Structure formats: C-alpha cells, structure tokens
Amino acid sequence: RQPGVEVRPLKQMTGSSEFCEVFMTGARVEKDNLIGRLGEGWAIANTTLGYERGGRSLARISGYASQYHHLVGAVRRLKRHGQPLIESPLVRQKLGKIWADLEVERYNALRVLTQLEKGEHPGAGGSLTKLSYSEFEKRFMEMAQEILGPYGQLTDGAPPELALEIDTAVGDQGTWAYAFLWSRAGTIYAGSSEIQKNVIGERILGLPKESRADRAGVAR
C-alpha cells in the first residue's frame, strides 16, 4: 500500500506463494514512520534478523519433534514385504539418526533461549542456529522420504490410518510431500545458508570479508 512499492508474489513448487519480489520505485517514507535514526536502517534490520533467526528456534525444534513422532507413528503402521517398517534395522537406524540430530538442535535452541533470558541479543550466534536447523529440516525431510517411499510422495488419497498428514513448518496442515518441498525454502528465508556461512565466517571466526562491489580493494 506504500506508494512506489510493488510486491509480486512468487509461485513456489508447493503451489503456494510465501515468497515475493519487491520493487521500490521512488518510494518515500514519512518522517513519523522512521524507525531509529536516519541511516541506521541496516543496523536495525540486522538486529531484527538476529531475533528472527535465533529467537524462535525452540518453537521450530518443537515442531520438528512433533513431525518426528508423526513419522514414527506412520512407520509403525506401514508394512513392507508383509513386515512393519519399524522392524527394519535400516529404518530404525535412520530414525535414530534423525532423533540424535534433533537433540543437537534442541540444545542449540536452549542455548539461544538462555541468552535471551539473560537479556542478551542472539547476535551472529543466531546465524549458527538458523544454519543448523534449516539444514537439519532438509536432511530430516529427505530421510523421511527414504523411509516412507511412495507413501511419502502422496499429496492426497493416503489411507487415514497411515497418519501421513503433519503440521508443516509454516503452520499449515500438509503432507510429507508438501513438507519435503517446503524444507527447501528453509535454506532461503531469513537469510540463505550461504549468507549465514558468511556471517559466521566474518563475525564469529574473524575471517577476511569477501569481495563486494561496495568494498573496493578488500581481498577475498
């Protein structure tokens, strides 16, 4: 609704449009709508991004845990070659791997929560958490597809007793197929995995900043 700002939704492979491209042409902001001081927009944006990336991480991990229990329930009901999937050593190994990774993510989220309770800002550490949980979500959904096989690709028509419907990361009721496709978005929104690696390298590890057009003469 802001004059000079055009928002164009991007159709995703999930069929929805949570991502958009934004064009600003001669857009001006009233002084009363200015947040902070003039010229401090980037610093303010970085602060809000820190909270976005790390502040809600525990809620995300709780969502992944719920999805995991849905997966275990489906595996108990599904059969392959006449035997419940849960009895397959390979399937049990994969479920154990997911759970172990999930516990790592939970402790990462608790670390951020402890910082917030102390009144501290997540800072660049939020990038560590965001990179970790978004890449985990992708691995989780890939492994879920390996375990469920063709059942994991169904978008409708699955027998209700298979419990394939889950709450996706965006809070919608979906399917394992939808969740698998949506997991790719996690490594893009709130800053892509590549951006998080840059933040971690520059602000946590102290590595040289990469070359940019507005950083003439800075070595890679």
Across the structure, where does each feature detected by a protein language model lie?
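Structured core elements
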Residues: 6, 21-23, 104, 182, ...
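Active-site lining segments that contact anionic ligands and/or coordinate catalytic metals
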Residues: 19, 39, 68, 123, ...
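Glycine-rich phosphate/cofactor-binding loops in nucleotide/flavin-utilizing enzymes
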Residues: 41-57, 151-220
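FAD-binding core of flavoproteins
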Residues: 1-76, 80, 202, 206-220
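Extended amphipathic alpha-helical segments enriched in small hydrophobics
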Residues: 56-120, 127-143
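Helix-rich, typically C-terminal accessory recognition domains appended to large enzymatic cores
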Residues: 143-151
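Tryptophan-centric aromatic hotspots in well-structured domains and transmembrane helices
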Residues: 19, 23, 42-44, 107-110, ...
